[in-house]
Amino acid sequence: MVVFPKSLSPKHVLKLLKSEKNPRAAFALFDSATRHPGYAHSAVVYHHILRRLSETRMVNHVSRIVELIRSQECKCDEDVALSVIKTYGKNSMPDQALDVFKRMREIFGCEPAIRSYNTLLNAFVEAKQWVKVESLFAYFETAGVAPNLQTYNVLIKMSCKKKEFEKARGFLDWMWKEGFKPDVFSYSTVINDLAKAGKLDDALELFDEMSERGVAPDVTCYNILIDGFLKEKDHKTAMELWDRLLEDSSVYPNVKTHNIMISGLSKCGRVDDCLKIWERMKQNEREKDLYTYSSLIHGLCDAGNVDKAESVFNELDERKASIDVVTYNTMLGGFCRCGKIKESLELWRIMEHKNSVNIVSYNILIKGLLENGKIDEATMIWRLMPAKGYAADKTTYGIFIHGLCVNGYVNKALGVMQEVESSGGHLDVYAYASIIDCLCKKKRLEEASNLVKEMSKHGVELNSHVCNALIGGLIRDSRLGEASFFLREMGKNGCRPTVVSYNILICGLCKAGKFGEASAFVKEMLENGWKPDLKTYSILLCGLCRDRKIDLALELWHQFLQSGLETDVMMHNILIHGLCSVGKLDDAMTVMANMEHRNCTANLVTYNTLMEGFFKVGDSNRATVIWGYMYKMGLQPDIISYNTIMKGLCMCRGVSYAMEFFDDARNHGIFPTVYTWNILVRAVVNR
């Protein structure tokens, strides 16, 4: 408690208030001084404490101070009144702001001038009281107050808040015409709201106009635009603006600019550009805050450059900075994703020691351990959570159960599920989906079906992941009828089939040669508003080709090309293989020739398939021409390519020709497999 001298002056109180950094403590000190015998606050002291209350949103105390000023008849200038009106405006209290404005002479002993009018006008804008804004602006003329640049800036702000951007642009044009030269605030207000509304091209156009008219943009203008373009993943335009900023001698990037660039570019996958900016910051000794480090670490971890991320993290640690849990979690996730389990556990110990752990940290570590096959370690962390004061959430359950299932521990996952439910916990649909999918893959369909019923009892709604797992399980068990029935019943159970659901079933039907039923489900897809995707067509095409129904396959191919979907090399290869299997080599060559027109490049599978096809019809010359094409296109043959040509040459020309390619393979560092030796041995035996 501060002990005041008997004779207390406002100057002494002001000094004490300025030295007190805690706003609440400062206000308590102000209150104590108010009660001191023979003491009265000065206008300067009132102004100081009102500003402090504004900063900390201690707005409930403002009215008491205003009443104190009035009762003590302390004559104040307009600045004191403005601080009150601003505070009320900032806290969405326009009625209180208006009351103070009307009583300025009574309370503060001063008349409202243009600044007071503008501040009240802004309070109405912040509260979105548009009618009062217009009424007050109309009152300017009655009161004999001439609007100034700041007045029009407030009106521009109102237009932007109302999304009336054309009106805001109109204000700017009118201001130039009438001699009110817009300033950087006028332009940045419109640019900011255009960017927030996603109208980045309009914002950039206004930014260019601003520069052309001689209004120098400040760093805030650059930050707004760069941030907007990076959020839209337009890193090219963002980099152009960055370069303009560096070339602009009147303004310099600040820590916020660097943070926007590093965070935004890393989200665009431009980590190399982030590192260039980082190095530039270090060379120029630019200020870096925790967010700068955290953003770069996050970007590097996402890009897989965990070693560099660790280096940046260590640099941050060496600064003795207070590292937050978000940054720790980012680094922990980076270590886990790249398999650095030792480093993950070392960092975990540090995090626990510094009490920088939350439930997200546990989720990251458990997931990382499970993804790297460390089941025992993950289980230990899971078991220790309650003792450490952390309760697992649905995400934790989902991660742990999914990880156990992926690693083949479905029984352990079932045990965890029972533990959770018996302790009053609840699993989400994704945890159930993991177990059901694993049970289906292990052909434990009855257990999977029972678990679906359990989900319903616990109020967990089915989703497509669960249903798709069951459909897949039924198909693997050759229960196609049940799979078809289940898909059609999905909608009745509150889960609409997706394209993936149909693709799983169509694939199973095609493998069983049931093309009529598969086609019926394609028709049903269309009727239910789903369009077959690339995978749907690939499944159908593969099934038809495998069943040597090439005419139907070609009909489907032309239907696919007319659908507007983009094809890929795999689909071309399916058709080429099908054509080769029935000896239609010329048609297969035509399909390959047309690949280039569809922005598709033939790969090794394409060439290997064609070579095999030509050898099967005894055309070794064209098969070897294909080999030449392969080299011409810059492809390096693999062991399958060598096996194909050696087998073909053994059949058509003899072992001696095949041995030339055998030697060539070894010269290129490609070593024979068992299949290679079988080809050569059979050729020698059959010679």
From Swiss-Prot:
Superkingdom assignment: Eukaryota
Keywords for the protein's UniProt record, in alphabetical order: Repeat
UniProt keyword Ribosomal protein, yes or no: no
PROSITE patterns registered for this protein in UniProt: PPR (PS51375)
Record-linked Gene3D superfamilies: Tetratricopeptide repeat domain
Matches recorded under SUPFAM superfamilies: HCP-like (SSF81901)
Repeat among keywords: yes
Family: Belongs to the PPR family. P subfamily.
Protein name: Pentatricopeptide repeat-containing protein At3g09060
Organism: Arabidopsis thaliana (Mouse-ear cress)
